[in-house]
Design a protein with these regions (language model features):
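Bacterial Sec-dependent N-terminal signal peptides
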Residues: 1-25, 202
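Short N-terminal segments immediately surrounding and downstream of signal-peptide cleavage
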Residues: 21-42
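Second-shell loop/turn segments in exported
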Residues: 24-30, 52-58, 63-69, 124-133, ...
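Metal-centered catalytic cores of metalloenzymes
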Residues: 33-39, 136, 154-156
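Hydrophobic packing residues in well-ordered alpha-helices of helical domains and bundles
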Residues: 34, 134-138, 175-178
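Acidic interhelical loop/turn segments
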Residues: 43-58, 116-128, 143-174
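Short, contiguous alpha-helical
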Residues: 55-105, 151, 155-202
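Surface-exposed, polar helix/loop patches in the mature regions of secreted/periplasmic/lumenal proteins
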Residues: 86-149
Length: 202
């Protein structure tokens, strides 16, 4: 989770640079963004074999399989963080503390100019043998997330404010972060596939 903490610092300090005060996303758009990010992952890994899934472009750089495993293990952790916020009493006085916009979150999290070395937790990550195996694991966690979103109104998600070490975001934005985080790693998968040494199909 260390790298996610770095992302949050970048995210919540990027508001002044990215912010263009505009209407945020609605709940339907949030759900569609989750669907879109899943479909994009499916497109990127479709047809890859086990060798391609485990290929790493170099030391400290993740394979497609590691990117997928990272999403599978971190999305439930991030959801739990949002769940705890929703279970806590609302503090209306914090609502004005949210300065970052939905657009800021997507732009900052998907910005691949900020990169970090692979964490030790993934160096020995299991290798998925097929795209279907990876997608099945991710699909299960996505269903839980979408069911969670369905339990609340947009107003309820906006009224619960999460305090990060460097700022504030509402619970809706915490969920948006999960989908944007997947979009970020989809771009990373594209980078892996574009490496000159990436194994070719026979």
């Amino acid at each position: 989770m260390k790298k996610l903490t770095i992302f949050l610092v970048l995210l919540l300090t990027a508001g002044d640079a990215f912010s263009q005060q505009q209407a945020g996303m609605n709940k339907q758009e949030l759900l569609e963004y989750f669907d879109q990010t899943f479909a994009n992952i499916q497109t990127e890994i479709e047809g890859l074999n086990a060798e391609q899934l485990k290929f790493s472009p170099g030391e400290g750089r993740w394979s497609v399989s590691q990117c997928l495993y990272h999403l599978v293990i971190t999305e439930p952790q991030l959801l739990e963080f949002v769940r705890q916020a929703m279970d806590a009493p609302a503090d209306p006085s914090l609502k004005d503390s949210v300065k970052i916009t939905d657009r800021d979150i997507i732009m900052a999290v998907t910005d691949r100019s900020h990169k970090a070395k692979a964490e030790n937790e993934l160096t020995d990550a299991p290798v998925y043998s097929s795209p279907r195996e990876a997608l099945s694991a991710l699909e299960s966690s996505r269903k839980i997330i979408k069911d969670f979103i369905g339990k609340y109104t947009e107003e309820e998600l906006r009224n619960k404010v999460i305090k990060w070490p460097v700022g504030y975001a509402d619970a809706f934005q915490g969920l948006l972060f999960i989908a944007a985080h997947a979009a970020r790693h989809t771009e990373q998968m594209k980078e892996v596939k574009s490496d000159p040494s990436f194994p070719k199909l026979p």
